[in-house]
Amino acid sequence: KKARQGVKIRAMFDAFGNLSNNKPLRAKHIKLLLQHDIEIVQFDPMRFPYINHALSRDHQKIVVIDGKVGYTGGMNIANYYINGLPEIGAWRDMHVRIEGDAVNDLQRIFLYMWNSETKQNIGGDEFFPLSQPGVKTNGNKQVAIVNRIPKKQPKLLRHTYIEAINAAKRKIQLINPYFTPTHSVVKALEDALARGVRVEIMIPGKSDIPFTPDAAFYAANQLRKKGAFIYIYNGGFHHSKIMMIDERFCTVGSMNLNSRS
């Protein structure tokens, strides 16, 4: 509909992630989109040997509209977000809408990924409006975009989480669907518990990935023994990736608490 109205649409999806979708994009779907003048490309198409492509994927979820409105978080564009999955039920997630200067950061990330994959060189003022309307925030809140480009800066997001955990004085609240944290994240949480910080962790009781709940239960139980409070979400599958520190700082994004993310 928007393409028929003259809106230029560019879309990128991860080739490996698409294969794991319950209703993946097929060649016929891509052909139909291209026929409607929608540019759509795969990030890092799967080629032999496939193992070389399995780990460093594009897990970002970004939408930028007219360079003025951005969306990011944990949500994929998939059928199961509407209908759920028979084996796990309804799918729950968290996304945020952003307006103002922080949208420029999301735009830069998209353009970098797009130009790197397509070898195009798009950019310029049309993507970065010179003036953004003033956007009121509740209590002068600040927004920062922290990004890890696939195959680059592998520890950036991990360090961001650890620094936030280390800064906690009263409470840490985590929701993550695949809770198998690295040793460094576990140590940061254990150190927080040792200094009297309340740590609350919510993990889903069911998962779209086999054996993930078992691994998450084990990791969470180890922290429970150190004093953490563990909550199991049984209302379907909770795909959100959220961390709150002292009810003052919050992350909403696409990073899972596992070594791959």
Summary of predicted features, one role per range:
Residues K1-S261:
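Charged, low-complexity intrinsically disordered terminal segments
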